[in-house]
Amino acid sequence: MKQHISDKQLSKFFKENKLAGAIHYHTTFNRRTRYITINNNCHSTILFIHGAPASLMESKEYFTDPELRQTFNMIAVDRPGYGRSGYGDPEPSIKKQADIVKGIIDECRIHRPFIIYAASYGASIACRLLMDFPLTADGLVLVAPSLCPGEEKYLWITPLVEHSFIRKIILPHHRTSNTEKFNHKDELSKMLPWWKNIRVPVMYIQGEKDKMIYTTNAGFARENLVNVPSLEINFIKGQKHVIDKKENPFIIKKILELLKQAGQLTKTTTTSNL
């Protein structure tokens, strides 16, 4: 499915899959960001934040999964510069992207426990969100996450593309991902003092042969997520950065395990506040 799927195509996808989906637009920093909600009449919520280059449709198999549909109301966002959120117009600031996502969450009716599922560069944004707003969610699923400054593959052509005529002729989603790649090390460095602010259970999942986001990010997570109640790290044998769809049952299992942990913590917190 193409990167910048239209609202009409998205509505068709909802209808074909019998999803109670709705399309919304949120404006922050003079940026218009598209997101969707899927109401499954459930008592918990999951938000999907995609990687780069991608769009909210990166998670379409999860939208239609029977087990997840029975468990979660769903939210998914086209990150700035992707899909119908200013296609090709990037936002290099991880903090600003996190603020945009927070604004979307505030517009939605969130049933808790609330889980955030984030992949690749989307994971950086999810972590920044919970650094700045620690009470926003109850658990994090990080898939092939970019967390540590510099611990990812950088291409020699990235700065050339960023500062030459090539930028004007590449596809819009590659223009956005190139800008994010060019700025990512500096943006992650700005987050270094704040990892202690994350206080929710974390499920880390990555292909053991990932050559795009290095597996050393797992060690960084162990060293820096010092205040999370739990951190489970899973490497999937034989998988690279983009994890094959055949592994979706394993990932869904891990999402549901995290939900159980988050639910227990939410119940404990509620009881302690009575």
Features from the language model and the residues they span:
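Conserved HGGG/HGGXW glycine-rich cap/lid loop of the alpha/beta-hydrolase fold
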Residues: 38-84
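Active-site loop/oxyanion-hole signature of alpha/beta-hydrolase fold enzymes
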Residues: 76-114
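Flexible "cap/lid" loop of the alpha/beta hydrolase fold
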Residues: 124-127, 131, 140-166
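Active-site nucleophile elbow and catalytic-triad environment of alpha/beta-hydrolase enzymes
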Residues: 178-194
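Short beta-strand/loop motif that positions the catalytic acidic residue
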Residues: 198, 204-206, 210
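Catalytic histidine-centered segment of alpha/beta-hydrolase-like enzymes
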Residues: 239-249
